[in-house]
């Protein structure tokens, strides 16, 4: 039986999965990008890419923090115009890098190419 992302993060401290959807294009591509997520251990910063789960639907969402609020984050997909207020407790992880299928190489969120994005 496959583990949930939360179980993977609790067990290993990180998880890998392929993205689905176009909300983070042009950075991440539908079914072509594989992201590396680490368990959230500290408050997120502006421009971090947060993984959160919407309690009403159980859907996982990977979007960028555009503003840090007191007990929440204002979050938006790179390819979206609407923003969502996400309570701190919904956030389960943060993207630390990704693999692009075409390039077949790892790009860290700390690297110059990512930082210039």
State what each model feature region is.
Residues 1-117:
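Extended hydrophobic leader/signal-anchor segments used for secretion and membrane insertion
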């Amino acid at each position: 039986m496959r583990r949930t992302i939360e179980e993977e993060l609790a067990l290993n401290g990180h998880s890998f999965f392929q993205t689905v959807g176009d909300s983070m294009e042009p950075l991440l591509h539908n079914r072509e990008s594989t992201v590396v997520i680490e368990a959230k251990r500290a408050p997120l910063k502006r421009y971090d890419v947060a993984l959160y789960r919407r309690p009403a639907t159980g859907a996982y969402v990977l979007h960028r923090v555009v503003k840090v609020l007191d007990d929440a984050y204002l979050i938006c997909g790179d390819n979206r115009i609407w923003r969502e207020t996400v309570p701190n407790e919904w956030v389960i992880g943060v993207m630390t890098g990704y693999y692009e299928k075409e390039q077949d190489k790892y790009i860290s969120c700390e690297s110059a190419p990512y930082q210039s994005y």
